[in-house]
Amino acid sequence: MYVTFNEALDSSFGNLESPNHDFKVGDPNMVPTPPMDSDSAAISLAFLISLSITFAILMLILVVIAAYVTFCGDDESEYDEENALGTRTSGTLHSLFGKKHSGILLDSSFASPGGFDDEIVLQERELEELPKMSAYEVELYIRAKEFQMMSPPMVKDFGTYLDSDDQQFIKDRGIQSYFLLPSINDNIDEYGNFLPSFIVQDKLDIQFSKFNKSSSTVMNYPLPHNRKDAVYFEVKIFRHIQKSNSIFSIGLTTVPYPYFRVPGMAKYSIAYESTGKLRINNPFTASTLLPKLEEGDTVGFGYRYKTGTIFITHNGKKLMDVTQNIGIDLFIGIGAFNAAYTRTYTRDGLLEDPDNVSFREALSEGKDIEVAKDLQRVHDPHDESDEMTSDEVELHVNLGQVGFVFIEANVKKYAFGSVYGQIGIPPAYNGTEIKKDTILQKGEELPPRYADTDNFFGSMKVKEGSSSRITAQTSKPLWSVGTYERISSNFDRENNVYHDSLETDDNNTDNNVNNNDENAGCNENSPLLEDDGNKRPENSNTPREVSDGAINKNPRNKSTKKRQRNRGKSSKKKNRSRK
Protein backbone atom coordinates (compact mmCIF):
# COMPACT_ATOMS: atom_id res chain seq x y z
CA MET A 1 0.00 0.00 0.00
CA TYR A 2 2.82 2.34 0.87
CA VAL A 3 4.73 1.55 -2.31
CA THR A 4 1.70 2.14 -4.45
CA PHE A 5 1.08 5.56 -2.92
CA ASN A 6 4.69 6.64 -3.50
CA GLU A 7 4.56 5.56 -7.07
CA ALA A 8 1.41 7.53 -7.67
CA LEU A 9 2.94 10.59 -6.08
CA ASP A 10 6.05 10.33 -8.24
CA SER A 11 4.00 9.97 -11.37
CA SER A 12 2.03 13.06 -10.49
CA PHE A 13 5.07 15.21 -9.97
CA GLY A 14 6.48 13.82 -13.16
CA ASN A 15 3.48 14.94 -15.09
CA LEU A 16 3.77 18.42 -13.63
CA GLU A 17 7.35 18.74 -14.79
CA SER A 18 6.61 17.52 -18.30
CA PRO A 19 7.00 20.11 -21.12
CA ASN A 20 3.34 19.76 -22.07
CA HIS A 21 2.31 22.03 -19.12
CA ASP A 22 2.54 25.82 -19.15
CA PHE A 23 3.90 26.11 -15.63
CA LYS A 24 6.37 24.28 -13.46
CA VAL A 25 6.38 23.41 -9.81
CA GLY A 26 9.24 25.77 -9.08
CA ASP A 27 7.42 28.75 -10.68
CA PRO A 28 6.67 31.25 -7.89
CA ASN A 29 3.76 32.86 -9.85
CA MET A 30 1.90 29.62 -10.04
CA VAL A 31 -1.49 29.77 -8.09
CA PRO A 32 -3.48 26.60 -7.80
CA THR A 33 -7.03 26.95 -9.09
CA PRO A 34 -9.65 26.12 -6.41
CA PRO A 35 -12.35 23.71 -7.29
CA MET A 36 -15.46 25.49 -8.73
CA ASP A 37 -18.85 24.90 -7.03
CA SER A 38 -21.76 25.06 -9.44
CA ASP A 39 -24.38 26.03 -6.72
CA SER A 40 -22.62 29.14 -5.28
CA ALA A 41 -24.19 31.60 -7.77
CA ALA A 42 -27.66 30.30 -7.05
CA ILE A 43 -27.13 30.59 -3.28
CA SER A 44 -25.99 34.24 -3.46
CA LEU A 45 -28.94 35.19 -5.67
CA ALA A 46 -31.43 33.61 -3.28
CA PHE A 47 -29.84 35.44 -0.36
CA LEU A 48 -30.19 38.82 -2.07
CA ILE A 49 -33.80 38.15 -2.99
CA SER A 50 -34.72 37.17 0.57
CA LEU A 51 -32.95 40.23 1.95
CA SER A 52 -34.84 42.58 -0.41
CA ILE A 53 -38.17 40.96 0.46
CA THR A 54 -37.44 41.44 4.15
CA PHE A 55 -36.65 45.13 3.68
CA ALA A 56 -39.76 45.57 1.53
CA ILE A 57 -41.98 44.05 4.21
CA LEU A 58 -40.43 46.27 6.87
CA MET A 59 -40.93 49.37 4.73
CA LEU A 60 -44.55 48.40 4.08
CA ILE A 61 -45.18 48.01 7.82
CA LEU A 62 -43.64 51.41 8.51
CA VAL A 63 -45.75 53.03 5.80
CA VAL A 64 -48.92 51.51 7.25
CA ILE A 65 -48.03 52.70 10.75
CA ALA A 66 -47.23 56.20 9.51
CA ALA A 67 -50.50 56.38 7.57
CA TYR A 68 -52.51 55.24 10.58
CA VAL A 69 -50.87 57.71 12.93
CA THR A 70 -51.34 60.52 10.42
CA PHE A 71 -54.98 59.96 9.46
CA CYS A 72 -56.42 57.98 12.38
CA GLY A 73 -54.49 59.38 15.32
CA ASP A 74 -55.11 62.58 17.29
CA ASP A 75 -55.29 65.70 15.18
CA GLU A 76 -53.89 68.26 17.54
CA SER A 77 -51.32 68.55 20.26
CA GLU A 78 -52.56 67.99 23.76
CA TYR A 79 -52.17 70.55 26.51
CA ASP A 80 -52.49 70.17 30.25
CA GLU A 81 -52.60 73.43 32.14
CA GLU A 82 -53.72 71.66 35.30
CA ASN A 83 -50.78 69.16 35.35
CA ALA A 84 -53.20 66.24 35.25
CA LEU A 85 -52.20 62.66 34.57
CA GLY A 86 -52.51 61.50 30.99
CA THR A 87 -54.17 58.38 29.71
CA ARG A 88 -54.38 56.63 26.37
CA THR A 89 -57.42 55.82 24.38
CA SER A 90 -58.59 52.26 24.08
CA GLY A 91 -57.52 50.00 21.26
CA THR A 92 -54.39 48.00 20.45
CA LEU A 93 -53.05 50.31 17.78
CA HIS A 94 -53.88 53.36 19.82
CA SER A 95 -52.02 51.89 22.75
CA LEU A 96 -48.98 51.19 20.63
CA PHE A 97 -48.83 54.13 18.27
CA GLY A 98 -51.39 56.63 19.50
CA LYS A 99 -50.38 60.00 20.89
CA LYS A 100 -50.22 60.31 24.60
CA HIS A 101 -53.07 62.34 26.09
CA SER A 102 -52.05 64.97 28.58
CA GLY A 103 -55.62 65.78 29.60
CA ILE A 104 -58.00 64.05 31.94
CA LEU A 105 -60.12 61.35 30.35
CA LEU A 106 -63.26 60.70 32.36
CA ASP A 107 -65.58 57.76 32.08
CA SER A 108 -68.77 57.74 30.05
CA SER A 109 -71.01 58.73 32.96
CA PHE A 110 -72.29 61.59 30.81
CA ALA A 111 -74.39 59.22 28.70
CA SER A 112 -75.10 56.94 31.66
CA PRO A 113 -75.68 59.16 34.71
CA GLY A 114 -75.14 56.21 37.02
CA GLY A 115 -75.89 57.53 40.48
CA PHE A 116 -79.07 59.18 39.29
CA ASP A 117 -80.47 55.79 38.30
CA ASP A 118 -79.84 54.30 41.72
CA GLU A 119 -82.50 55.67 44.02
CA ILE A 120 -80.74 54.64 47.21
CA VAL A 121 -77.47 56.32 46.24
CA LEU A 122 -79.38 59.41 45.11
CA GLN A 123 -81.25 59.67 48.39
CA GLU A 124 -78.02 59.40 50.36
CA ARG A 125 -76.46 62.12 48.23
CA GLU A 126 -79.47 64.37 48.66
CA LEU A 127 -79.40 63.95 52.44
CA GLU A 128 -75.76 64.97 52.39
CA GLU A 129 -75.83 67.86 49.92
CA LEU A 130 -79.26 69.51 50.17
CA PRO A 131 -78.71 70.85 53.72
CA LYS A 132 -75.68 72.73 52.37
CA MET A 133 -77.84 74.59 49.84
CA SER A 134 -80.06 77.62 50.14
CA ALA A 135 -83.84 77.43 49.86
CA TYR A 136 -83.70 78.76 46.31
CA GLU A 137 -81.14 76.12 45.27
CA VAL A 138 -83.32 73.35 46.70
CA GLU A 139 -86.31 74.78 44.87
CA LEU A 140 -84.46 74.74 41.54
CA TYR A 141 -83.24 71.19 42.16
CA ILE A 142 -86.75 69.89 42.85
CA ARG A 143 -88.20 71.76 39.86
CA ALA A 144 -85.54 70.34 37.53
CA LYS A 145 -86.13 66.84 38.86
CA GLU A 146 -89.87 67.12 38.27
CA PHE A 147 -89.32 68.72 34.87
CA GLN A 148 -87.25 65.80 33.60
CA MET A 149 -89.72 63.32 35.03
CA MET A 150 -92.55 64.96 33.10
CA SER A 151 -90.42 65.59 29.98
CA PRO A 152 -87.68 62.95 29.77
CA PRO A 153 -84.55 63.90 27.80
CA MET A 154 -84.47 62.71 24.20
CA VAL A 155 -81.47 60.40 24.13
CA LYS A 156 -81.29 59.51 20.44
CA ASP A 157 -78.49 58.21 18.29
CA PHE A 158 -76.35 60.87 16.70
CA GLY A 159 -77.89 62.28 13.53
CA THR A 160 -81.43 60.98 14.10
CA TYR A 161 -83.03 64.10 15.61
CA LEU A 162 -83.45 66.08 12.38
CA ASP A 163 -85.99 65.20 9.72
CA SER A 164 -85.50 65.62 5.99
CA ASP A 165 -86.93 69.15 5.92
CA ASP A 166 -84.57 70.36 8.65
CA GLN A 167 -81.60 68.75 6.95
CA GLN A 168 -82.46 70.40 3.65
CA PHE A 169 -82.93 73.76 5.35
CA ILE A 170 -79.49 73.47 6.99
CA LYS A 171 -77.94 72.59 3.63
CA ASP A 172 -79.57 75.60 2.00
CA ARG A 173 -78.84 78.15 4.72
CA GLY A 174 -75.69 76.80 6.34
CA ILE A 175 -74.70 78.48 9.59
CA GLN A 176 -77.42 81.08 9.07
CA SER A 177 -80.00 78.43 10.03
CA TYR A 178 -78.74 78.17 13.64
CA PHE A 179 -79.94 80.43 16.45
CA LEU A 180 -80.39 80.43 20.22
CA LEU A 181 -83.93 80.06 21.55
CA PRO A 182 -85.40 83.18 23.21
CA SER A 183 -86.14 83.67 26.88
CA ILE A 184 -89.18 82.01 28.46
CA ASN A 185 -91.79 84.34 29.96
CA ASP A 186 -90.92 83.42 33.54
CA ASN A 187 -90.09 86.71 35.27
CA ILE A 188 -92.86 89.31 35.41
CA ASP A 189 -93.45 92.35 37.58
CA GLU A 190 -96.54 93.23 39.59
CA TYR A 191 -98.19 94.74 36.50
CA GLY A 192 -97.61 91.66 34.36
CA ASN A 193 -94.79 93.13 32.29
CA PHE A 194 -92.28 90.65 30.94
CA LEU A 195 -88.80 90.95 32.45
CA PRO A 196 -86.54 88.90 30.16
CA SER A 197 -83.75 86.94 31.80
CA PHE A 198 -81.66 87.29 28.65
CA ILE A 199 -81.84 88.77 25.18
CA VAL A 200 -80.65 87.03 22.02
CA GLN A 201 -79.20 89.36 19.40
CA ASP A 202 -78.11 88.49 15.87
CA LYS A 203 -79.17 84.86 16.42
CA LEU A 204 -75.99 83.82 18.26
CA ASP A 205 -75.19 86.65 20.69
CA ILE A 206 -76.75 86.39 24.15
CA GLN A 207 -76.86 88.97 26.92
CA PHE A 208 -78.10 88.07 30.41
CA SER A 209 -79.98 90.99 31.91
CA LYS A 210 -80.19 92.36 35.42
CA PHE A 211 -83.52 90.55 35.92
CA ASN A 212 -81.91 87.14 35.55
CA LYS A 213 -82.11 84.78 38.53
CA SER A 214 -81.42 81.42 36.91
CA SER A 215 -82.01 80.67 33.24
CA SER A 216 -80.55 78.93 30.20
CA THR A 217 -81.11 78.47 26.50
CA VAL A 218 -80.20 75.91 23.84
CA MET A 219 -79.56 75.94 20.11
CA ASN A 220 -82.44 75.19 17.78
CA TYR A 221 -80.53 72.35 16.04
CA PRO A 222 -78.06 69.77 17.42
CA LEU A 223 -74.42 69.38 16.49
CA PRO A 224 -74.20 68.61 12.76
CA HIS A 225 -72.08 66.10 10.88
CA ASN A 226 -69.79 68.26 8.77
CA ARG A 227 -68.05 65.35 6.96
CA LYS A 228 -64.85 66.07 8.91
CA ASP A 229 -63.15 64.41 11.86
CA ALA A 230 -64.90 66.62 14.42
CA VAL A 231 -67.26 69.55 14.89
CA TYR A 232 -66.30 72.52 17.04
CA PHE A 233 -67.68 75.81 18.36
CA GLU A 234 -66.39 78.66 20.54
CA VAL A 235 -67.95 81.18 22.90
CA LYS A 236 -66.34 84.58 23.39
CA ILE A 237 -66.85 86.33 26.76
CA PHE A 238 -67.51 89.97 25.85
CA ARG A 239 -68.74 91.27 29.21
CA HIS A 240 -68.14 89.82 32.65
CA ILE A 241 -66.92 92.16 35.35
CA GLN A 242 -64.56 91.07 38.10
CA LYS A 243 -66.15 89.90 41.37
CA SER A 244 -69.45 89.57 39.56
CA ASN A 245 -72.45 88.03 41.28
CA SER A 246 -73.39 86.27 38.03
CA ILE A 247 -72.02 82.81 37.22
CA PHE A 248 -72.49 81.37 33.73
CA SER A 249 -72.01 77.94 32.19
CA ILE A 250 -71.23 76.85 28.62
CA GLY A 251 -71.66 73.28 27.46
CA LEU A 252 -73.68 70.60 25.72
CA THR A 253 -77.10 69.27 26.70
CA THR A 254 -79.97 67.15 25.48
CA VAL A 255 -83.50 68.43 24.89
CA PRO A 256 -85.83 69.26 26.43
CA TYR A 257 -83.64 70.89 29.05
CA PRO A 258 -84.97 72.84 32.08
CA TYR A 259 -84.96 76.48 31.02
CA PHE A 260 -84.41 77.60 34.64
CA ARG A 261 -81.33 75.41 35.17
CA VAL A 262 -77.83 76.08 33.85
CA PRO A 263 -76.08 73.34 31.83
CA GLY A 264 -74.25 70.67 33.81
CA MET A 265 -76.74 70.56 36.69
CA ALA A 266 -79.30 68.20 35.14
CA LYS A 267 -79.23 64.81 33.46
CA TYR A 268 -77.34 64.38 30.21
CA SER A 269 -75.51 67.71 30.31
CA ILE A 270 -71.90 68.79 30.53
CA ALA A 271 -70.68 72.34 31.14
CA TYR A 272 -67.66 74.54 31.77
CA GLU A 273 -68.56 76.86 34.63
CA SER A 274 -67.09 80.34 34.89
CA THR A 275 -65.71 79.45 38.33
CA GLY A 276 -63.52 76.78 36.73
CA LYS A 277 -65.69 73.85 37.78
CA LEU A 278 -66.46 71.03 35.38
CA ARG A 279 -70.01 69.77 35.82
CA ILE A 280 -71.26 66.50 34.33
CA ASN A 281 -74.81 65.64 35.45
CA ASN A 282 -73.89 67.14 38.81
CA PRO A 283 -76.14 69.60 40.67
CA PHE A 284 -74.11 69.15 43.86
CA THR A 285 -70.52 69.97 44.74
CA ALA A 286 -68.20 69.88 41.71
CA SER A 287 -64.44 69.87 41.38
CA THR A 288 -62.44 72.80 40.05
CA LEU A 289 -60.45 71.32 37.17
CA LEU A 290 -60.35 74.20 34.69
CA PRO A 291 -59.10 77.81 34.68
CA LYS A 292 -61.49 80.49 35.87
CA LEU A 293 -63.07 82.50 33.09
CA GLU A 294 -62.64 86.25 32.75
CA GLU A 295 -63.74 88.91 30.33
CA GLY A 296 -62.02 88.40 26.98
CA ASP A 297 -61.53 84.63 27.32
CA THR A 298 -62.68 82.15 24.69
CA VAL A 299 -64.07 78.71 25.54
CA GLY A 300 -64.39 75.97 22.94
CA PHE A 301 -66.14 72.60 22.80
CA GLY A 302 -65.45 69.91 20.23
CA TYR A 303 -66.97 66.52 19.44
CA ARG A 304 -65.19 63.71 17.58
CA TYR A 305 -67.49 61.53 15.54
CA LYS A 306 -65.37 58.38 15.47
CA THR A 307 -64.66 57.98 19.18
CA GLY A 308 -67.53 60.05 20.59
CA THR A 309 -65.05 62.18 22.54
CA ILE A 310 -65.85 65.66 23.86
CA PHE A 311 -62.87 67.97 24.34
CA ILE A 312 -62.57 71.47 25.79
CA THR A 313 -60.29 74.35 24.78
CA HIS A 314 -59.43 77.60 26.54
CA ASN A 315 -58.04 80.58 24.62
CA GLY A 316 -56.97 78.39 21.71
CA LYS A 317 -55.31 75.64 23.78
CA LYS A 318 -56.78 72.24 24.33
CA LEU A 319 -57.27 71.43 28.01
CA MET A 320 -58.60 67.89 28.12
CA ASP A 321 -60.75 65.15 26.68
CA VAL A 322 -63.74 65.11 28.99
CA THR A 323 -65.58 61.94 28.03
CA GLN A 324 -65.80 59.36 25.27
CA ASN A 325 -68.20 56.93 23.61
CA ILE A 326 -70.91 59.59 23.34
CA GLY A 327 -73.15 58.79 20.39
CA ILE A 328 -76.25 60.93 20.97
CA ASP A 329 -77.52 64.23 19.58
CA LEU A 330 -76.24 67.14 21.66
CA PHE A 331 -77.26 70.80 21.67
CA ILE A 332 -75.25 73.87 22.59
CA GLY A 333 -76.41 75.11 25.99
CA ILE A 334 -75.65 78.43 27.72
CA GLY A 335 -76.96 79.54 31.11
CA ALA A 336 -76.35 81.91 34.01
CA PHE A 337 -77.62 82.45 37.55
CA ASN A 338 -77.29 84.96 40.37
CA ALA A 339 -74.86 83.58 42.95
CA ALA A 340 -76.27 85.88 45.65
CA TYR A 341 -79.30 83.57 45.93
CA THR A 342 -77.14 80.47 46.56
CA ARG A 343 -75.25 79.25 49.58
CA THR A 344 -72.73 77.34 47.49
CA TYR A 345 -71.17 80.50 46.07
CA THR A 346 -71.57 82.87 49.03
CA ARG A 347 -69.17 83.26 51.95
CA ASP A 348 -70.13 80.14 53.92
CA GLY A 349 -70.26 77.89 50.89
CA LEU A 350 -66.93 79.14 49.55
CA LEU A 351 -65.25 78.38 52.87
CA GLU A 352 -66.63 74.82 52.78
CA ASP A 353 -65.49 74.24 49.21
CA PRO A 354 -62.44 71.93 49.33
CA ASP A 355 -60.98 73.59 46.25
CA ASN A 356 -60.78 77.02 47.93
CA VAL A 357 -57.57 76.31 49.82
CA SER A 358 -56.56 79.97 49.81
CA PHE A 359 -59.72 80.94 51.70
CA ARG A 360 -59.12 78.44 54.47
CA GLU A 361 -55.46 79.42 54.77
CA ALA A 362 -56.37 83.09 55.01
CA LEU A 363 -59.00 82.27 57.63
CA SER A 364 -56.55 80.23 59.70
CA GLU A 365 -53.97 83.03 59.55
CA GLY A 366 -56.54 85.60 60.61
CA LYS A 367 -56.49 87.51 57.33
CA ASP A 368 -59.49 89.14 55.70
CA ILE A 369 -61.22 87.08 53.04
CA GLU A 370 -62.00 89.08 49.91
CA VAL A 371 -65.57 88.26 48.92
CA ALA A 372 -67.83 90.42 46.78
CA LYS A 373 -70.29 92.57 48.68
CA ASP A 374 -73.30 90.80 47.20
CA LEU A 375 -71.90 87.40 48.19
CA GLN A 376 -71.38 88.07 51.90
CA ARG A 377 -74.66 86.33 52.74
CA VAL A 378 -77.53 84.46 51.09
CA HIS A 379 -80.33 86.62 49.68
CA ASP A 380 -83.95 85.60 49.18
CA PRO A 381 -85.31 86.12 45.64
CA HIS A 382 -88.93 85.89 46.88
CA ASP A 383 -88.48 88.82 49.24
CA GLU A 384 -88.81 92.10 47.34
CA SER A 385 -86.79 93.99 49.93
CA ASP A 386 -83.94 91.47 49.62
CA GLU A 387 -83.79 91.09 45.84
CA MET A 388 -80.45 91.63 44.11
CA THR A 389 -79.95 92.76 40.52
CA SER A 390 -77.71 90.46 38.53
CA ASP A 391 -74.57 91.70 36.85
CA GLU A 392 -74.93 91.58 33.08
CA VAL A 393 -73.06 88.95 31.10
CA GLU A 394 -72.61 89.06 27.31
CA LEU A 395 -71.48 86.02 25.32
CA HIS A 396 -70.97 85.58 21.56
CA VAL A 397 -71.17 82.14 19.93
CA ASN A 398 -68.96 81.33 16.94
CA LEU A 399 -70.02 78.34 14.84
CA GLY A 400 -67.46 79.00 12.14
CA GLN A 401 -68.85 82.18 10.59
CA VAL A 402 -65.53 83.78 11.60
CA GLY A 403 -62.13 82.28 12.35
CA PHE A 404 -61.60 80.20 15.48
CA VAL A 405 -59.03 80.96 18.15
CA PHE A 406 -58.22 77.24 18.15
CA ILE A 407 -55.92 77.03 15.11
CA GLU A 408 -56.41 73.32 14.44
CA ALA A 409 -60.15 73.89 14.07
CA ASN A 410 -59.44 76.31 11.23
CA VAL A 411 -56.96 73.99 9.54
CA LYS A 412 -59.14 70.89 9.85
CA LYS A 413 -62.34 72.84 9.06
CA TYR A 414 -64.32 71.88 12.15
CA ALA A 415 -67.00 74.55 11.54
CA PHE A 416 -70.71 73.73 11.53
CA GLY A 417 -70.79 74.15 7.77
CA SER A 418 -70.57 76.84 5.15
CA VAL A 419 -71.55 80.34 6.16
CA TYR A 420 -74.35 80.82 3.60
CA GLY A 421 -75.12 77.25 2.56
CA GLN A 422 -75.96 76.13 -0.94
CA ILE A 423 -78.17 79.13 -1.68
CA GLY A 424 -75.17 81.40 -1.45
CA ILE A 425 -74.57 84.98 -0.47
CA PRO A 426 -77.61 87.31 -0.57
CA PRO A 427 -77.61 90.28 -2.96
CA ALA A 428 -75.25 93.11 -2.06
CA TYR A 429 -76.88 96.32 -0.88
CA ASN A 430 -73.70 98.27 -0.23
CA GLY A 431 -74.01 100.48 -3.31
CA THR A 432 -71.32 98.94 -5.52
CA GLU A 433 -73.84 98.11 -8.24
CA ILE A 434 -75.76 101.36 -7.84
CA LYS A 435 -72.64 103.42 -8.46
CA LYS A 436 -72.48 102.03 -12.00
CA ASP A 437 -75.86 103.57 -12.90
CA THR A 438 -75.25 106.63 -15.10
CA ILE A 439 -78.59 108.27 -14.31
CA LEU A 440 -78.13 107.98 -10.58
CA GLN A 441 -74.60 109.30 -10.88
CA LYS A 442 -75.96 112.31 -12.76
CA GLY A 443 -78.54 112.83 -10.07
CA GLU A 444 -75.83 112.91 -7.45
CA GLU A 445 -73.85 115.49 -9.46
CA LEU A 446 -76.88 117.78 -9.95
CA PRO A 447 -79.11 117.59 -6.87
CA PRO A 448 -82.47 119.39 -7.08
CA ARG A 449 -82.69 122.90 -5.66
CA TYR A 450 -85.34 123.51 -3.03
CA ALA A 451 -86.74 126.86 -1.95
CA ASP A 452 -85.44 128.49 1.19
CA THR A 453 -88.99 129.13 2.43
CA ASP A 454 -90.79 126.98 4.92
CA ASN A 455 -92.99 125.18 2.40
CA PHE A 456 -93.64 124.92 -1.30
CA PHE A 457 -95.78 128.08 -1.50
CA GLY A 458 -93.66 130.10 0.90
CA SER A 459 -94.22 131.01 4.52
CA MET A 460 -98.01 131.12 4.32
CA LYS A 461 -100.46 131.41 7.20
CA VAL A 462 -104.19 130.96 6.60
CA LYS A 463 -106.87 132.22 8.95
CA GLU A 464 -110.34 130.77 8.70
CA GLY A 465 -113.25 133.18 8.64
CA SER A 466 -116.77 132.98 7.25
CA SER A 467 -117.59 130.60 4.44
CA SER A 468 -117.88 133.46 1.99
CA ARG A 469 -114.59 135.15 2.82
CA ILE A 470 -111.11 133.66 3.30
CA THR A 471 -108.27 135.96 4.13
CA ALA A 472 -104.61 135.18 3.71
CA GLN A 473 -101.78 136.86 5.56
CA THR A 474 -98.24 136.42 4.50
CA SER A 475 -94.95 137.51 5.96
CA LYS A 476 -93.89 138.74 2.51
CA PRO A 477 -95.97 140.63 -0.10
CA LEU A 478 -97.46 138.27 -2.65
CA TRP A 479 -96.85 138.68 -6.33
CA SER A 480 -99.49 140.03 -8.62
CA VAL A 481 -101.17 137.80 -11.13
CA GLY A 482 -98.98 139.07 -13.91
CA THR A 483 -95.81 138.39 -12.01
CA TYR A 484 -97.06 134.93 -11.13
CA GLU A 485 -97.96 134.25 -14.77
CA ARG A 486 -94.57 135.36 -16.01
CA ILE A 487 -92.84 133.05 -13.58
CA SER A 488 -95.08 130.03 -14.07
CA SER A 489 -95.77 130.02 -17.81
CA ASN A 490 -93.07 130.02 -20.46
CA PHE A 491 -95.61 130.79 -23.19
CA ASP A 492 -96.97 133.88 -21.43
CA ARG A 493 -93.50 135.01 -20.54
CA GLU A 494 -92.41 134.92 -24.19
CA ASN A 495 -95.56 136.10 -26.06
CA ASN A 496 -97.52 138.44 -23.75
CA VAL A 497 -96.81 141.80 -22.23
CA TYR A 498 -98.14 142.53 -18.75
CA HIS A 499 -98.90 145.77 -16.95
CA ASP A 500 -98.83 145.41 -13.20
CA SER A 501 -99.56 149.06 -12.41
CA LEU A 502 -103.32 149.12 -13.02
CA GLU A 503 -105.30 151.03 -10.50
CA THR A 504 -108.30 149.67 -8.65
CA ASP A 505 -111.54 151.22 -7.69
CA ASP A 506 -112.07 151.00 -3.92
CA ASN A 507 -115.70 152.01 -4.03
CA ASN A 508 -116.74 149.31 -6.46
CA THR A 509 -114.96 146.63 -4.44
CA ASP A 510 -117.26 146.61 -1.40
CA ASN A 511 -120.42 146.73 -3.52
CA ASN A 512 -119.30 143.90 -5.77
CA VAL A 513 -118.41 141.65 -2.83
CA ASN A 514 -121.94 141.89 -1.41
CA ASN A 515 -123.57 141.18 -4.79
CA ASN A 516 -121.44 138.12 -5.70
CA ASP A 517 -122.31 134.60 -4.63
CA GLU A 518 -120.07 132.34 -2.52
CA ASN A 519 -118.31 130.70 -5.43
CA ALA A 520 -117.52 133.98 -7.08
CA GLY A 521 -116.27 135.34 -3.79
CA CYS A 522 -114.02 132.36 -3.21
CA ASN A 523 -112.60 132.58 -6.70
CA GLU A 524 -111.92 136.31 -6.47
CA ASN A 525 -110.36 136.02 -2.99
CA SER A 526 -107.46 133.85 -4.07
CA PRO A 527 -104.13 134.79 -2.44
CA LEU A 528 -102.65 135.08 -5.90
CA LEU A 529 -104.82 138.15 -6.61
CA GLU A 530 -103.61 140.04 -3.55
CA ASP A 531 -100.87 142.58 -4.14
CA ASP A 532 -99.64 144.46 -1.10
CA GLY A 533 -97.42 146.65 -3.24
CA ASN A 534 -100.44 148.20 -5.03
CA LYS A 535 -102.55 148.25 -1.83
CA ARG A 536 -105.50 146.43 -3.35
CA PRO A 537 -108.40 145.56 -1.08
CA GLU A 538 -109.19 141.99 -0.10
CA ASN A 539 -112.13 141.38 -2.43
CA SER A 540 -111.12 143.73 -5.22
CA ASN A 541 -112.79 143.17 -8.58
CA THR A 542 -110.23 145.12 -10.58
CA PRO A 543 -109.61 143.87 -14.09
CA ARG A 544 -106.78 141.45 -14.70
CA GLU A 545 -103.89 142.37 -16.85
CA VAL A 546 -104.30 141.14 -20.39
CA SER A 547 -101.88 140.85 -23.25
CA ASP A 548 -101.85 143.04 -26.32
CA GLY A 549 -104.83 142.29 -28.51
CA ALA A 550 -106.65 140.36 -25.78
CA ILE A 551 -110.34 141.14 -25.14
CA ASN A 552 -111.60 141.77 -21.62
CA LYS A 553 -115.09 140.32 -21.30
CA ASN A 554 -115.84 141.78 -17.88
CA PRO A 555 -118.75 144.29 -18.24
CA ARG A 556 -117.51 146.39 -15.35
CA ASN A 557 -114.19 146.82 -17.11
CA LYS A 558 -116.04 147.95 -20.27
CA SER A 559 -117.99 150.59 -18.39
CA THR A 560 -114.83 151.91 -16.84
CA LYS A 561 -113.20 152.23 -20.24
CA LYS A 562 -116.26 154.07 -21.62
CA ARG A 563 -116.14 156.60 -18.82
CA GLN A 564 -112.45 157.16 -19.48
CA ARG A 565 -113.15 157.66 -23.18
CA ASN A 566 -116.01 160.05 -22.48
CA ARG A 567 -113.80 162.05 -20.17
CA GLY A 568 -111.17 162.18 -22.86
CA LYS A 569 -113.70 163.39 -25.45
CA SER A 570 -115.15 166.01 -23.13
CA SER A 571 -111.70 167.35 -22.35
CA LYS A 572 -110.93 167.62 -26.07
CA LYS A 573 -114.17 169.53 -26.71
CA LYS A 574 -113.39 171.98 -23.93
CA ASN A 575 -109.96 172.58 -25.36
CA ARG A 576 -111.43 173.24 -28.79
CA SER A 577 -114.00 175.60 -27.41
CA ARG A 578 -111.34 177.57 -25.58
CA LYS A 579 -109.39 177.88 -28.73
Swiss-Prot record:
Gene Ontology cellular-component annotations: endoplasmic reticulum; endosome membrane; fungal-type vacuole; vacuolar membrane
Protein family membership: Belongs to the SSH4 family.
Gene3D superfamilies (alphabetical): 2.60.120.920
Phosphoserine, modified sites: 358
Source organism of this protein record: Saccharomyces cerevisiae (strain ATCC 204508 / S288c) (Baker's yeast)
Glycosylated residues (UniProt): 212, 356, 430, 507, 557, 575
Domain B30.2/SPRY: 166-364
Lineage: Eukaryota, Fungi, Dikarya, Ascomycota, Saccharomycotina
Gene transcribed to yield this protein: SSH4
Protein name as annotated: Protein SSH4
A GO biological process held by the record: protein transport to vacuole involved in ubiquitin-dependent protein catabolic process via the multivesicular body sorting pathway
Membrane-spanning parts: 45-65
GO molecular function: ubiquitin-like ligase-substrate adaptor activity
Note: Present with 450 molecules/cell in log phase SD medium.
Topological domains, Cytoplasmic: 1-44
Record topological domains on the Lumenal side: 66-579
Classification via InterPro entries: B30.2/SPRY, B30.2/SPRY_sf, ConA-like_dom_sf, SPRY_dom, Ubq-SigPath_Reg
Predominant location category: membrane
Role noted for this protein: Components of the endosome-vacuole trafficking pathway that regulates nutrient transport. May be involved in processes which determine whether plasma membrane proteins are degraded or routed to the plasma membrane. Confers leflunomide resistance when overexpressed.
Pfam family, one: SPRY
Region feature (Disordered): 499-579
